[in-house]
Amino acid sequence: MSVVVGGVEYSLNNWAKYEIKRRAAELESVNYYPHCEYVMPEDIVVSILGSKPNCPFLEALKRFHDFLKKRRIIFKGEYLVIPWMGAQDVADMIHHVENRINLDHLEDLAHMLKLITYHRSFDTCINQSFEHLYAFKFPDANIETHELKHIRQLEKKMYGYILRLEKLQTVLTFYIEFLLKQV
């Protein structure tokens, strides 16, 4: 598994040793994304797993460029950077994209995207709810128990949890409900 911090991809082990707060401060000071003035650790970063040029989810998002642009969502290679827009905006975006590409089940999205989110509210609100989801068996990395504990300690020191959302039918449903409750 890898994570993206400020547009730079790190392997999980290397990233776990990295000083996230220092990196975030650097990005803030240099305006890493020239078209997005406030790239913060709280941003939601959506990574498209499908690397093929005709990935249907990615193509669908591109077709709705105006919709995305209004919400200051930008493409960075295969990645989307979505500034924290507020609960209703995020929920609307999820529903909008899902409806427009005519997916019958959120499960279909599981093969196309992963959601990495840094947000303080997740530290307490989702801690218990995602406890059973946190021990995912990642397909591209073997994570030992002690490494996982170390990673979780680091995450609590920074801005939230890293969620590798493999079972999106369950998780995104909860996520949308969680966002709507914050409105």
UniProtKB/Swiss-Prot annotation:
This entry's comment on induction and repression of expression is: Expressed in the late phase of the viral replicative cycle.
Superkingdom field? Viruses
Q: Which UniProt keywords apply?
A: Late protein
Hey, which family's this protein in? Belongs to the asfivirus S183L family.
The name this protein carries in UniProt is: Uncharacterized protein S183L
